[in-house]
Amino acid sequence: MKIMRKVLCLVMAIVMLSTAAIAANACTTVAVGKDASADGSTMVAHSVDGWYDERIEIVKGGTHAEGEMVDIYRDPCQDGYREVQLVGQIPQVAETYTYFDTGYPFMNEKGVTIGEHTWSGDYNAFYNGETALFMIANLQALGLQRASTAKECVQIMGALAEEYGYADGGETLLVADKDEIWIFEISGPGMFWTKDSGKPGAHWAARRVPDDEIHSGANRSILREIDFNDPENYMWSTDITEYPKELGYWTEGEPFNYSIIFDTVEGNEAYTCSGRVWRVYDLLANSQGFEICNEEQALTQLPFSVKPDQKVTLQDIFAVCSRFLAQATILSP
Protein backbone atom coordinates (compact mmCIF):
# COMPACT_ATOMS: atom_id res chain seq x y z
CA MET A 1 0.00 0.00 0.00
CA LYS A 2 2.90 2.38 0.72
CA ILE A 3 4.20 2.06 -2.82
CA MET A 4 0.71 2.36 -4.31
CA ARG A 5 0.08 5.58 -2.35
CA LYS A 6 3.33 7.07 -3.61
CA VAL A 7 2.57 6.11 -7.20
CA LEU A 8 -0.93 7.55 -6.94
CA CYS A 9 0.32 10.80 -5.37
CA LEU A 10 2.87 11.20 -8.14
CA VAL A 11 0.37 10.52 -10.90
CA MET A 12 -2.16 12.90 -9.35
CA ALA A 13 0.50 15.61 -9.26
CA ILE A 14 1.26 15.06 -12.92
CA VAL A 15 -2.44 15.27 -13.77
CA MET A 16 -2.61 18.59 -11.91
CA LEU A 17 0.34 19.85 -13.92
CA SER A 18 -1.59 19.13 -17.09
CA THR A 19 -4.50 21.34 -16.07
CA ALA A 20 -2.24 24.38 -15.93
CA ALA A 21 -0.50 23.63 -19.19
CA ILE A 22 -0.34 25.79 -22.26
CA ALA A 23 -1.36 24.60 -25.71
CA ALA A 24 2.15 23.69 -26.76
CA ASN A 25 1.43 19.97 -27.16
CA ALA A 26 4.70 19.19 -25.41
CA CYS A 27 5.25 16.47 -22.82
CA THR A 28 8.20 15.57 -20.62
CA THR A 29 8.46 12.14 -19.01
CA VAL A 30 10.68 10.69 -16.30
CA ALA A 31 11.04 7.09 -15.09
CA VAL A 32 12.96 5.86 -12.06
CA GLY A 33 13.94 2.21 -11.65
CA LYS A 34 13.35 0.57 -8.27
CA ASP A 35 17.06 0.42 -7.41
CA ALA A 36 17.53 4.06 -8.41
CA SER A 37 14.86 5.32 -6.01
CA ALA A 38 15.33 6.10 -2.33
CA ASP A 39 12.67 3.68 -1.10
CA GLY A 40 12.70 0.93 -3.73
CA SER A 41 9.64 2.21 -5.60
CA THR A 42 9.43 2.50 -9.35
CA MET A 43 8.26 5.95 -10.42
CA VAL A 44 6.82 7.35 -13.63
CA ALA A 45 6.12 11.05 -14.21
CA HIS A 46 4.34 12.66 -17.16
CA SER A 47 3.68 16.36 -17.73
CA VAL A 48 1.11 17.19 -20.42
CA ASP A 49 1.32 20.59 -22.08
CA GLY A 50 -1.79 20.79 -24.22
CA TRP A 51 -5.56 20.97 -24.10
CA TYR A 52 -6.58 17.46 -23.08
CA ASP A 53 -9.40 16.13 -20.97
CA GLU A 54 -8.13 16.47 -17.38
CA ARG A 55 -11.24 15.04 -15.71
CA ILE A 56 -10.51 11.83 -13.78
CA GLU A 57 -12.94 8.93 -13.95
CA ILE A 58 -12.66 5.63 -12.11
CA VAL A 59 -13.67 2.95 -14.62
CA LYS A 60 -14.75 -0.15 -12.74
CA GLY A 61 -13.50 -3.57 -13.74
CA GLY A 62 -15.46 -6.78 -13.50
CA THR A 63 -16.39 -10.02 -15.18
CA HIS A 64 -17.94 -10.08 -18.64
CA ALA A 65 -20.21 -12.40 -20.54
CA GLU A 66 -19.07 -14.31 -23.59
CA GLY A 67 -19.84 -12.33 -26.73
CA GLU A 68 -19.67 -8.92 -25.02
CA MET A 69 -18.04 -6.20 -27.15
CA VAL A 70 -16.02 -3.06 -26.38
CA ASP A 71 -16.83 0.19 -28.19
CA ILE A 72 -13.80 2.00 -29.65
CA TYR A 73 -14.00 5.79 -30.06
CA ARG A 74 -11.68 7.95 -32.13
CA ASP A 75 -9.33 10.19 -30.13
CA PRO A 76 -10.94 9.85 -26.68
CA CYS A 77 -8.23 11.89 -24.94
CA GLN A 78 -10.03 15.09 -25.96
CA ASP A 79 -13.60 13.94 -25.40
CA GLY A 80 -14.30 16.84 -23.03
CA TYR A 81 -14.02 19.34 -25.87
CA ARG A 82 -15.80 17.78 -28.82
CA GLU A 83 -17.94 14.83 -29.78
CA VAL A 84 -16.12 11.57 -30.37
CA GLN A 85 -16.84 9.14 -33.16
CA LEU A 86 -17.59 5.45 -32.65
CA VAL A 87 -15.22 3.73 -35.07
CA GLY A 88 -15.57 0.06 -34.20
CA GLN A 89 -15.82 -2.71 -31.65
CA ILE A 90 -13.59 -5.51 -30.40
CA PRO A 91 -14.41 -8.57 -28.26
CA GLN A 92 -14.33 -8.05 -24.51
CA VAL A 93 -12.20 -10.29 -22.27
CA ALA A 94 -13.60 -12.37 -19.42
CA GLU A 95 -12.22 -10.11 -16.66
CA THR A 96 -11.11 -6.47 -16.56
CA TYR A 97 -9.41 -4.37 -13.87
CA THR A 98 -10.49 -1.02 -12.47
CA TYR A 99 -8.43 1.87 -13.82
CA PHE A 100 -8.13 5.66 -13.69
CA ASP A 101 -9.20 7.34 -16.92
CA THR A 102 -8.37 10.88 -18.02
CA GLY A 103 -7.02 12.37 -21.26
CA TYR A 104 -4.37 9.66 -21.17
CA PRO A 105 -5.40 6.74 -18.89
CA PHE A 106 -2.70 6.31 -16.24
CA MET A 107 -3.08 3.53 -13.63
CA ASN A 108 -5.03 0.39 -12.72
CA GLU A 109 -5.83 -1.47 -9.52
CA LYS A 110 -2.83 -3.78 -10.03
CA GLY A 111 -0.41 -0.85 -9.90
CA VAL A 112 0.35 -0.81 -13.62
CA THR A 113 1.11 2.83 -14.43
CA ILE A 114 1.56 4.65 -17.76
CA GLY A 115 3.15 7.97 -18.74
CA GLU A 116 3.07 9.30 -22.31
CA HIS A 117 4.69 11.61 -24.82
CA THR A 118 3.99 12.14 -28.51
CA TRP A 119 6.53 12.36 -31.33
CA SER A 120 4.30 11.93 -34.41
CA GLY A 121 7.09 10.62 -36.67
CA ASP A 122 7.05 10.17 -40.43
CA TYR A 123 3.36 10.61 -41.29
CA ASN A 124 3.85 10.08 -45.02
CA ALA A 125 5.33 6.62 -44.47
CA PHE A 126 3.53 5.27 -41.42
CA TYR A 127 0.31 7.13 -40.62
CA ASN A 128 -3.05 5.43 -41.23
CA GLY A 129 -6.14 7.25 -39.99
CA GLU A 130 -8.61 5.51 -42.27
CA THR A 131 -8.53 1.71 -41.92
CA ALA A 132 -6.67 1.41 -38.60
CA LEU A 133 -8.73 1.42 -35.39
CA PHE A 134 -6.81 2.53 -32.30
CA MET A 135 -5.51 5.87 -31.06
CA ILE A 136 -2.91 5.73 -28.29
CA ALA A 137 -5.44 6.49 -25.52
CA ASN A 138 -7.54 3.50 -26.67
CA LEU A 139 -4.53 1.22 -26.27
CA GLN A 140 -3.70 2.66 -22.85
CA ALA A 141 -7.23 2.04 -21.60
CA LEU A 142 -7.36 -1.50 -22.94
CA GLY A 143 -3.90 -2.31 -21.60
CA LEU A 144 -4.79 -1.07 -18.13
CA GLN A 145 -8.09 -2.95 -18.14
CA ARG A 146 -6.45 -6.23 -19.08
CA ALA A 147 -2.90 -6.32 -17.65
CA SER A 148 -1.56 -7.10 -14.18
CA THR A 149 2.11 -6.32 -14.99
CA ALA A 150 3.97 -3.77 -17.09
CA LYS A 151 5.32 -6.38 -19.48
CA GLU A 152 1.88 -7.88 -19.98
CA CYS A 153 0.48 -4.41 -20.67
CA VAL A 154 3.07 -3.83 -23.41
CA GLN A 155 2.30 -7.21 -24.96
CA ILE A 156 -1.47 -6.62 -24.90
CA MET A 157 -1.26 -3.14 -26.44
CA GLY A 158 1.15 -4.36 -29.10
CA ALA A 159 -0.96 -7.38 -30.02
CA LEU A 160 -4.17 -5.34 -30.27
CA ALA A 161 -2.49 -2.71 -32.44
CA GLU A 162 -1.08 -5.37 -34.76
CA GLU A 163 -4.49 -7.03 -35.16
CA TYR A 164 -6.76 -3.99 -35.53
CA GLY A 165 -4.38 -1.27 -36.68
CA TYR A 166 -2.84 1.81 -35.09
CA ALA A 167 -4.36 5.09 -36.33
CA ASP A 168 -2.33 7.63 -34.35
CA GLY A 169 1.04 9.32 -34.80
CA GLY A 170 4.23 8.04 -33.20
CA GLU A 171 3.95 7.68 -29.43
CA THR A 172 6.03 6.68 -26.42
CA LEU A 173 4.54 5.11 -23.29
CA LEU A 174 6.41 4.59 -20.02
CA VAL A 175 4.80 1.44 -18.60
CA ALA A 176 5.63 0.50 -15.01
CA ASP A 177 4.67 -1.86 -12.24
CA LYS A 178 6.22 -2.24 -8.78
CA ASP A 179 9.18 -4.19 -10.18
CA GLU A 180 10.09 -2.87 -13.62
CA ILE A 181 9.61 -0.20 -16.28
CA TRP A 182 9.29 -0.68 -20.04
CA ILE A 183 9.49 2.10 -22.63
CA PHE A 184 6.99 1.24 -25.38
CA GLU A 185 7.03 3.03 -28.74
CA ILE A 186 4.60 2.60 -31.59
CA SER A 187 4.12 3.85 -35.14
CA GLY A 188 1.43 3.16 -37.73
CA PRO A 189 1.32 0.56 -40.52
CA GLY A 190 1.23 2.94 -43.48
CA MET A 191 -1.68 4.36 -45.44
CA PHE A 192 -2.31 1.24 -47.53
CA TRP A 193 -2.73 -1.19 -44.63
CA THR A 194 -6.01 -3.05 -44.17
CA LYS A 195 -7.02 -5.60 -41.53
CA ASP A 196 -7.23 -8.39 -44.11
CA SER A 197 -3.83 -7.61 -45.64
CA GLY A 198 -2.08 -10.25 -43.54
CA LYS A 199 0.41 -7.63 -42.33
CA PRO A 200 0.71 -6.21 -38.80
CA GLY A 201 -1.30 -3.05 -38.16
CA ALA A 202 1.47 -1.35 -36.20
CA HIS A 203 5.23 -1.20 -35.80
CA TRP A 204 6.13 -1.20 -32.12
CA ALA A 205 9.05 -2.00 -29.88
CA ALA A 206 9.84 -1.76 -26.18
CA ARG A 207 12.98 -1.48 -24.10
CA ARG A 208 13.39 -2.17 -20.40
CA VAL A 209 14.83 0.52 -18.14
CA PRO A 210 17.65 -0.91 -15.97
CA ASP A 211 16.54 -1.12 -12.34
CA ASP A 212 19.34 1.16 -11.12
CA GLU A 213 18.84 3.89 -13.73
CA ILE A 214 16.52 6.77 -14.61
CA HIS A 215 15.06 7.56 -18.03
CA SER A 216 13.65 10.70 -19.65
CA GLY A 217 11.88 11.39 -22.94
CA ALA A 218 10.27 14.45 -24.51
CA ASN A 219 8.42 14.32 -27.83
CA ARG A 220 11.06 12.36 -29.72
CA SER A 221 11.48 8.63 -30.25
CA ILE A 222 13.91 7.47 -27.59
CA LEU A 223 14.34 3.69 -28.04
CA ARG A 224 17.41 3.85 -30.31
CA GLU A 225 18.86 0.52 -31.51
CA ILE A 226 16.82 -2.65 -30.93
CA ASP A 227 18.87 -5.68 -29.88
CA PHE A 228 17.03 -8.64 -31.38
CA ASN A 229 19.39 -10.97 -29.49
CA ASP A 230 18.24 -9.70 -26.08
CA PRO A 231 14.56 -10.63 -25.57
CA GLU A 232 14.92 -10.13 -21.81
CA ASN A 233 15.31 -6.38 -22.29
CA TYR A 234 13.64 -5.76 -25.66
CA MET A 235 10.29 -6.60 -27.25
CA TRP A 236 9.15 -5.88 -30.80
CA SER A 237 6.26 -6.34 -33.21
CA THR A 238 5.80 -9.05 -35.80
CA ASP A 239 7.91 -8.52 -38.94
CA ILE A 240 9.05 -5.12 -37.66
CA THR A 241 11.89 -4.94 -40.21
CA GLU A 242 9.84 -5.76 -43.33
CA TYR A 243 8.00 -2.50 -44.05
CA PRO A 244 11.02 -0.23 -43.34
CA LYS A 245 13.03 -2.46 -45.67
CA GLU A 246 10.37 -2.09 -48.40
CA LEU A 247 10.53 1.70 -48.02
CA GLY A 248 14.31 1.75 -48.19
CA TYR A 249 14.49 3.08 -44.62
CA TRP A 250 16.56 0.12 -43.43
CA THR A 251 19.00 -2.31 -45.07
CA GLU A 252 19.52 -5.90 -43.98
CA GLY A 253 22.63 -6.21 -41.83
CA GLU A 254 22.51 -2.65 -40.48
CA PRO A 255 21.66 -1.90 -36.84
CA PHE A 256 17.90 -1.49 -36.48
CA ASN A 257 17.60 1.98 -34.94
CA TYR A 258 13.90 2.45 -34.22
CA SER A 259 14.28 6.18 -33.57
CA ILE A 260 15.96 6.93 -36.90
CA ILE A 261 13.63 4.68 -38.92
CA PHE A 262 10.27 5.77 -37.51
CA ASP A 263 10.89 9.34 -36.31
CA THR A 264 12.12 12.42 -38.21
CA VAL A 265 15.19 13.17 -36.13
CA GLU A 266 18.03 13.24 -38.64
CA GLY A 267 18.94 16.80 -39.65
CA ASN A 268 16.81 18.33 -36.89
CA GLU A 269 18.82 21.12 -35.27
CA ALA A 270 16.15 22.26 -32.79
CA TYR A 271 16.67 22.05 -29.02
CA THR A 272 13.00 22.02 -28.06
CA CYS A 273 12.76 18.36 -27.07
CA SER A 274 16.35 17.35 -26.41
CA GLY A 275 16.74 20.36 -24.12
CA ARG A 276 14.11 19.01 -21.75
CA VAL A 277 15.71 15.56 -21.59
CA TRP A 278 19.10 17.16 -21.06
CA ARG A 279 17.71 19.23 -18.18
CA VAL A 280 16.30 16.16 -16.42
CA TYR A 281 19.69 14.46 -16.60
CA ASP A 282 21.41 17.71 -15.65
CA LEU A 283 19.32 17.85 -12.48
CA LEU A 284 19.48 14.18 -11.47
CA ALA A 285 22.86 13.09 -12.90
CA ASN A 286 24.78 16.35 -12.97
CA SER A 287 28.18 14.79 -12.23
CA GLN A 288 28.19 13.10 -15.63
CA GLY A 289 28.43 16.46 -17.38
CA PHE A 290 25.93 15.98 -20.19
CA GLU A 291 26.03 18.85 -22.66
CA ILE A 292 23.04 20.48 -24.31
CA CYS A 293 22.55 19.20 -27.85
CA ASN A 294 20.04 19.35 -30.70
CA GLU A 295 17.55 16.63 -31.63
CA GLU A 296 19.83 14.78 -34.03
CA GLN A 297 22.84 14.95 -31.71
CA ALA A 298 20.74 13.67 -28.81
CA LEU A 299 20.57 10.22 -30.43
CA THR A 300 24.23 9.70 -29.60
CA GLN A 301 24.97 12.28 -26.89
CA LEU A 302 22.07 11.72 -24.49
CA PRO A 303 21.63 8.14 -23.24
CA PHE A 304 18.42 6.12 -23.15
CA SER A 305 18.89 5.88 -19.39
CA VAL A 306 21.51 6.88 -16.84
CA LYS A 307 22.50 6.20 -13.22
CA PRO A 308 21.48 9.15 -11.00
CA ASP A 309 24.00 10.87 -8.74
CA GLN A 310 22.00 9.80 -5.69
CA LYS A 311 18.89 7.81 -4.93
CA VAL A 312 15.87 9.67 -6.29
CA THR A 313 13.00 10.63 -3.99
CA LEU A 314 9.41 11.43 -4.79
CA GLN A 315 10.15 15.03 -3.88
CA ASP A 316 12.97 15.09 -6.44
CA ILE A 317 10.53 14.09 -9.17
CA PHE A 318 8.01 16.70 -8.04
CA ALA A 319 10.76 19.32 -8.30
CA VAL A 320 11.91 18.17 -11.74
CA CYS A 321 8.39 18.12 -13.14
CA SER A 322 7.08 21.33 -11.60
CA ARG A 323 9.95 23.75 -12.14
CA PHE A 324 10.66 25.68 -15.33
CA LEU A 325 13.21 23.25 -16.73
CA ALA A 326 15.23 25.85 -18.66
CA GLN A 327 15.59 28.29 -15.79
CA ALA A 328 19.18 29.45 -15.16
CA THR A 329 20.55 27.27 -17.97
CA ILE A 330 21.86 27.89 -21.48
CA LEU A 331 18.23 27.52 -22.67
CA SER A 332 16.90 30.24 -20.38
CA PRO A 333 15.12 32.96 -22.42
Where are these regions (language model features)?
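Sec-dependent signal peptide cleavage junction
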Residues: 17-26
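Second-shell loop/turn segments in exported
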Residues: 126-129, 138-147
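Intrinsically disordered or highly flexible coil/loop and linker segments, enriched in small
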Residues: 20, 166-170, 330
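A contiguous strand-loop segment
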Residues: 27-135, 156-312
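Aromatic- and Gly/Pro-rich donor/ligand-binding loops
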Residues: 153
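Long, well-ordered mid-to-C-terminal structural blocks that present hydrophobic/aromatic surfaces
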Residues: 300-333
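Bacterial N-terminal signal peptides that target proteins for export
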Residues: 1-11
